[in-house]
């Protein structure tokens, strides 16, 4: 398992969590990940889980990283006026079965820790951001089984 993050504190937290869950010996944690590194995982069954706050539009490009064609990916998308969900998923249509999953509203009544709060505070506690961040679920048509 590989994890990458540009934030040193996040890398340290990842290592602590891996240790607490008994998987520290199965994870490598490094800093920034370059598109050329995808080639390292060719020939292996690979699932890429990615939430990189908009950088997915640059990093995850099959034209730059042909290895992506055989990987399955789950990517949180951060579209804006310059980057659309359709633009991102279109680049994978030849190599992947593409599914876009829209986030759903969460019920604050399901979380006991929120029940003592006023209703508006409960609602705000569950809002991560103002804009929806859908997931792209990309299943390779050529994945290694």
Feature locations, PLM:
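Rossmann-like AdoMet/SAM-dependent catalytic core
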Residues: 81-145
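S-adenosyl-L-methionine
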Residues: 4-57
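Short, solvent-exposed loop/turn segments at secondary-structure junctions
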Residues: 8-9, 55, 79-80, 142-144
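Hydrophobic "anchor" residues on beta-strands that sit immediately upstream
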Residues: 1, 47, 72
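A short, conserved alpha-helix within the catalytic core of class I
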Residues: 54-64, 84-85
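Hydrophobic/aromatic beta-strand patches that form the interior of the parallel beta-sheet core
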Residues: 2-4, 30, 74, 99
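Short, conserved loop/helix-junction motifs that constitute active-site signature segments
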Residues: 41-42, 62-70, 91-93
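Conserved beta-strand signature within the Rossmann-like core of class I S-adenosyl-L-methionine
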Residues: 69-80
